[in-house]
């Protein structure tokens, strides 16, 4: 029998998220009508942008728009940069005031919150679900979806608490005693310590700050009152804590790279406005904003001659100034040699003159810098390291000629290799430990190349490879506490070059 169609579930053709069964159309559905037209689907463009690790400011649609605006201005397009106003943010009552105390001001530079009462937690409207679905986020409920929407729009992570969990009507930002047990939203138990920042009520922690919420403190269908959080946490604290607990979320991804320290209030107001519109809530307190030491813009002195030399082309002072101002850098002083700039605090990657030049060249266009007719170079003289590298290559080529294959393993290794073996000549006390391990399996630097080589052998055997002959060139690392001293603690650490077969 010839088949002119196919049976589909909702998620297979993009009209829903259900995969429970096939779509059954009513009898009056017009035969031959395009499915997109029948389901009132609108076409849209999804642009995937690779953001480099240093561009934390671009981890949101607003940040990308800022860059696009600067490029359009540079290329002669008449355009403007604007975002929704906060005029609709109006405090309805003072029924649910929340106090805030920051005990650890190093880890938490700013913390703001607002309470919303009489909310109806329910499914988000279709337009909001569509916007989240198209960027790969799963809709949960209207309150949680609003926080995710604001995060993706402006790059500021938010968190929402059930107000009933905020006992004492007070939020305290602090670390916990070593060994404190905490269960996250996914039901996993974690052990907190003095290096883990947490958001607490008057009695207990409710959330691992900037990373993961606690079980029972989230927003559910029975929730009526919520507290919205908008904060700035120190990137290093969040990064180390996330690695320590093996947690990675959209929020931690942004916090550990550095969010805009002056964008918390705008994001909080926009979220509160949406809560009123989509959940019928009432704003029940003035925004509580604790910001002990406001973070300042970065002062940078940029000389025109330096910029032209680094770019490799004289693009002119006016072009430099126009691009700098379009990137929201303020010119505070100008003379014949250059300009004094204030770089926005959200540009954590632009703190030196060379960083400013890189930003200017990026907007000006690398392709607009012509290749010069003369290229400058410097003479180099081979030293002992070059000779050693040459000798290493000769040996490697000889081994390859004999049928060996070169492997390259990670210098990071499992801690268990130095603790679980009964007859281990590489004691744990001599390993170089990593302060912020990428994972639980990569917690120390290797003392020997043996374990990495055996891993490669095992992996290849499991893939049915035969006649395995490997060699590897690399370093091993050793810690000798007997050589440690306060005057020169680095003497306790050493590395050696090895070739293993």
Q: What do the PLM-derived regions correspond to, one by one?
A:
Residues 32-52, 95-134, 235-255, 293, ...:
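Residues forming anionic-ligand binding surfaces in small-molecule and nucleic-acid pockets
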Residues 216-269:
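Glycine-rich, small/acidic residue-mixed loop/short-helix segments
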């Amino acid at each position: 029998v010839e088949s002119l169609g196919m049976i589909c579930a909702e998620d297979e053709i993009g009209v829903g998220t259900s995969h429970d069964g096939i779509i059954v159309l009513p009898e009056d559905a017009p035969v031959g009508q395009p499915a997109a037209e029948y389901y009132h689907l609108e076409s849209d463009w999804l642009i995937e942008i690779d953001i480099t690790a240093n561009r934390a400011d671009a981890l949101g649609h607003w940040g990308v728009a800022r860059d696009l605006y600067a490029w359009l201005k540079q290329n002669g397009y008449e355009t403007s940069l604007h975002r929704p106003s906060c005029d609709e943010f109006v405090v309805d009552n003072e029924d649910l005031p929340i106090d805030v105390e920051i005990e650890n001001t190093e880890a938490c530079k700013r913390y703001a919150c607002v309470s919303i009462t009489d909310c109806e937690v329910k499914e988000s409207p279709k337009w909001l679900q569509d916007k989240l679905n198209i960027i790969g986020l799963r809709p949960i409920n209207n309150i949680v979806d609003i926080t995710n929407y604001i995060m993706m729009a402006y790059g500021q992570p938010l968190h929402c608490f059930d107000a009933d969990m905020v006992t004492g009507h007070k939020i305290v930002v602090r670390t916990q005693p070593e060994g404190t047990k905490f269960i996250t939203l996914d039901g996993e138990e974690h052990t907190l310590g003095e290096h883990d920042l947490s958001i607490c009520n008057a009695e207990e922690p409710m959330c691992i700050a900037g990373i993961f919420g606690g079980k029972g403190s989230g927003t559910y269908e029975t929730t009526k009152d919520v507290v919205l959080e908008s904060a700035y946490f120190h990137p290093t604290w969040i990064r180390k804590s996330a690695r320590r607990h093996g947690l990675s979320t959209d929020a931690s991804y942004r916090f550990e790279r550095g969010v805009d320290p002056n964008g918390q209030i705008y994001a909080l107001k926009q979220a509160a406005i949406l809560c009123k519109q989509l959940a019928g809530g009432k704003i029940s307190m003035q925004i509580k904003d604790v910001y002990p030491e406001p973070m300042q813009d970065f002062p940078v002195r940029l000389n025109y001659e330096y910029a032209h030399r680094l770019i490799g082309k004289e693009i002119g002072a006016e072009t430099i100034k126009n691009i700098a101002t379009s990137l929201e850098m303020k010119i505070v002083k100008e003379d014949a040699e250059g300009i004094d700039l204030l770089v926005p605090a959200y540009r954590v990657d632009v703190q030196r003159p060379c960083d400013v030049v890189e930003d200017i060249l990026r907007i000006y266009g690398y392709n607009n810098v012509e290749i010069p007719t003369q290229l400058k170079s410097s003479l180099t003289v081979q030293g002992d390291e070059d000779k050693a590298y040459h000798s290493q290559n000769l040996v490697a080529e000889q081994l390859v000629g004999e049928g060996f294959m070169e492997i390259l393993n990670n210098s990071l290794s499992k801690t268990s290799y130095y603790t679980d073996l009964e007859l281990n000549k590489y004691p744990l006390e001599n390993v170089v430990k990593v302060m912020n391990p990428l994972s639980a399996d990569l917690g120390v630097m290797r003392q020997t190349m043996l374990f990495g080589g055996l891993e490669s052998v095992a992996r290849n055997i499991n893939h049915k490879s035969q006649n395995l002959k490997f060699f590897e060139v690399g370093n091993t690392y050793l810690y000798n506490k007997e050589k440690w001293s306060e005057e020169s603690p680095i003497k306790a650490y050493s590395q050696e070059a090895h070739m293993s077969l």
